[in-house]
Design a protein with these regions (language model features):
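Bacterial N-terminal signal peptides
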Residues: 7-16
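Extracellular glycan-targeting catalytic surfaces
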Residues: 19-183
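Positively charged n-region of N-terminal signal peptides that target proteins for export
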Residues: 1-4
Length: 183
């Protein structure tokens, strides 16, 4: 967890560098370079894992459709087969979260590798970023369909909601990374 926090901090500093009057890139290099490169070295060994690796049994979509369930919705104790009921602020630990976790992993790996590339200009990092990006968005067997029709589903109420876009907030790091890599 410490390494992830350090890498996230480093990425934030890189992105804020254009707004700061001092050389934040030099500061990041001096303080965090070793940790960033260590994490990126581990990420180079990791194969892409997309949502197609995790079957969402309750989804009406197929393996290419991102699926998540509303956090605060629970089985109704008075009717276990009926629609779920809301428990504000109480996350249901039985909810399907594998697609969210895969996306968080993807964005973390891409961010880490991008940070390492910005520090070293070593093209291995860019090549590995692109391997993950192709797996998520291009490869016919592993891609994620570019819609969120089944995100934030609630059993017995809806197969998905527009608020599901919040589950993809992590893709901002991927987009920023690709922008920084000028791809």
């Amino acid at each position: 967890m410490r390494q992830i926090t350090i890498v996230i901090f480093a990425v934030i500093l890189f992105f804020l560098s254009s707004c700061m009057p001092y050389d934040s890139k030099k500061y990041v290099e001096e303080i965090l370079k070793d940790d960033i490169l260590e994490q990126a070295a581990m990420n180079l060994q990791e194969s892409p894992v997309t949502i197609t690796s995790f079957i969402a049994e309750r989804s009406v979509g197929d393996c290419h459709d991102f699926y998540s369930e509303g956090d605060y919705w629970w089985p109704n104790p008075l009717d276990l087969e009926g629609p779920y009921v809301r428990r504000d602020g109480q996350t249901n630990p039985e909810n399907f979260v594998a697609h969210r976790q895969a996306m968080i992993r993807f964005s973390s790996i891409v961010g880490n590798l991008t940070s390492a590339y910005l520090l070293t200009k070593d093209n291995r990092y860019v090549e590995n970023v692109m391997e993950h990006v192709r797996a998520w968005f291009v490869n016919e067997q592993t891609f994620m369909r570019p819609k969120l029709q089944y995100a934030q589903a609630i059993k017995g109420i809806t197969t998905g909601r527009g608020i599901g876009i919040i589950d993809t907030v992590h893709l901002m790091e991927v987009a920023q990374s690709l922008y920084r890599l000028e791809i």
